[in-house]
């Protein structure tokens, strides 16, 4: 080649590459597909896993301070279960849980306390089938992995894990051990969420195109929990990350509406965070100037907003805000070609409505229908029709907690697949990590790992089941 100027060529090539990146013809590194780790040598998919039937589900609890104590109460009222052991590092809450079990006329569970790793002693018992894990977030993944390694099913509070690596470790362990690992997303068992799932399955909204999910819940008051309870550890996550810290409550139901991991999956997301102002202002107002809460650097944006694109092209907005003064909301919005359902407050607008078309005619989608009575009558989920009164009587966020636990036990006792599997927990939880990565990279898109390793293409959609 004559008259080749290497410096000029490299300069021109660099400019061309930059132009291709900004034009979208070449993806930035953050949007490149993530390398899928190899399948474990002795593992296989747990999609639709059916475990051997358990006539009695023998339970061990790890963590009974707040959520875990509520689970203990519910398990005392479930048929076909035995509470064998309870573990907590706090002797006071451990004794409280054991005393409650005994007060119900049930056998006294064995107690485990001591170090943060004492739970491993409990997991070595051969008379426990499942472990219920309700501990601070950073313990969820290691405890779930240890549970499965000890030949037990793991049921974990949200979120499932706090890193992409932990998500893969949990998936790999589940596939190798062939044990269930379910992240206990209770909101999927709410009456409204179950009704909407039933409506989606019946085609009421047409083809789905968009969803909106959120966890908007003012929790600044937890900053006053200094020595124990949720605020003693959750507050510090606002100083460590800047993204969606808690995505699953809103995202879980919307994912099931859209058959995520069962015919569609998350492809990539982009995220933005607002300024982080509210917690520092609250600390300044509520605590002395030299208080430890005023020495923290709160970096997590008060409002986190993510947009997810699925492989089928659908979009999902996911928000997180536990700081600003505003009413509670999970959004719970699902939009289809025939109309929309939105929550908080519940309302429906359809182009072809089974009610408005007959009564008034014309286009009913220009006005919200906020009277849910007839919608419940027509579309209440069979589970809620059969178990709703018992769920409400036992309580737990309007009955969703009890119904979730009841359904878990039912599936284990009847050799049926669980409603949520390890792939769901990983996909919903990893938004936490990916949103932070996007925020830190000027909101560039970040690709979701395919935790199913392609099994989402043939996964069976969650059915409408009864009791």
From Swiss-Prot:
Keywords: Glycosidase, Hydrolase, NAD, Signal. InterPro entries: Gfo/Idh/MocA-like_OxRdtase_N, Gfo/Idh/MocA_oxidrdct_glycsds, Glyco_hydro_109_C, NAD(P)-bd_dom_sf, TAT_signal, TAT_signal_bac_arc. Its cofactor is NAD(+). Substrate binds at residues 215, 234, 246-249, 328. It is an enzyme of class 3 (hydrolase). Binds 1 NAD(+) per subunit. The NAD(+) cannot dissociate. Coiled coil: none annotated. It comes from the Bacteria. One of its GO terms (molecular function) is hydrolase activity, acting on glycosyl bonds. Residues 1-31 form the signal peptide. It holds the Pfam family Glyco_hydro_109_C. Gene3D superfamilies: Dihydrodipicolinate Reductase, domain 2, NAD(P)-binding Rossmann-like Domain. NCBIfam families: TAT_signal_seq. Glycosidase. Belongs to the Gfo/Idh/MocA family. Glycosyl hydrolase 109 subfamily. This is Glycosyl hydrolase family 109 protein. It comes from Shewanella woodyi (strain ATCC 51908 / MS32). The lineage of its organism: Bacteria, Pseudomonadati, Pseudomonadota, Gammaproteobacteria, Alteromonadales.
């Amino acid at each position: 080649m004559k008259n080749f100027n290497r410096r000029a060529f490299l300069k021109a090539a660099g400019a061309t590459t930059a132009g291709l990146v900004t034009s979208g013809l070449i993806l930035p590194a953050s949007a490149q597909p993530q390398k899928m780790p190899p399948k474990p040598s002795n593992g296989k998919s747990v999609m639709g896993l059916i475990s051997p039937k358990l006539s009695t589900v023998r339970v061990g609890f790890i963590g009974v301070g707040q959520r875990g104590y509520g689970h203990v109460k519910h398990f005392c009222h479930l048929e076909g279960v035995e509470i064998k052991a309870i573990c907590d590092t706090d002797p006071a809450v451990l004794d409280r849980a054991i005393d409650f079990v005994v007060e119900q006329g049930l056998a006294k569970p064995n107690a485990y306390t001591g170090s943060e790793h004492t739970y491993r002693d409990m997991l070595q018992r051969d008379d426990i089938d499942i472990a219920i894990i309700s501990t601070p977030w950073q313990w969820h993944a290691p405890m779930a992995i240890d549970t499965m390694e000890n030949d037990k099913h793991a049921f974990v509070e949200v979120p499932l894990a706090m890193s992409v690596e932990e998500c893969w470790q949990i998936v790999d362990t589940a596939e190798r051990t062939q044990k269930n690992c379910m992240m206990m997303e209770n909101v999927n068992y709410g009456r409204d969420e179950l009704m909407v799932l039933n409506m989606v399955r019946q085609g009421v909204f047409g083809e789905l195109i968009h969803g909106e999910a959120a966890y908007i819940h003012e929790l600044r008051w937890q900053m006053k929990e200094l020595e124990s309870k949720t605020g003693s550890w959750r507050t510090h996550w606002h100083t460590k990350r800047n993204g969606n810290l808690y995505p699953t409550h809103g995202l879980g139901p919307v994912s099931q509406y859209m058959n995520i991991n069962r015919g569609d999956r998350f492809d990539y997301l982009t995220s933005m965070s607002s300024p982080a102002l509210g917690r520092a202002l609250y600390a300044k107002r509520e605590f002395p100037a030299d208080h430890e809460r005023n020495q923290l650097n709160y970096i997590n944006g008060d409002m986190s907003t993510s947009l997810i694109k699925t492989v089928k092209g659908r979009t999902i907005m996911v928000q997180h805000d536990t700081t600003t003064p505003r009413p509670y909301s999970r959004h719970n919005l699902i939009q289809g070609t025939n109309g929309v359902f939105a929550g908080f407050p519940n309302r429906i607008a359809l182009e072809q409505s089974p009610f408005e078309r007959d009564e008034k005619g014309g286009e009913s989608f220009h006005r919200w229908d906020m009277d849910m009575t007839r919608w419940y009558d027509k579309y209440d989920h069979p589970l809620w029709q059969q178990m709703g009164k018992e769920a409400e009587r036992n309580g737990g966020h309007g009955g969703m907690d009890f119904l979730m636990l009841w359904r878990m036990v039912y599936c284990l006792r009847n050799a049926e697949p669980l409603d949520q599997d390890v792939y769901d927990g990983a996909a919903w939880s990893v938004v936490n990590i990916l949103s932070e990565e996007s925020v830190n990279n000027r909101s560039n898109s970040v690709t979701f790992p395919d935790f199913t390793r392609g099994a989402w293409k043939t996964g069976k959609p969650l059915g409408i089941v009864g009791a």
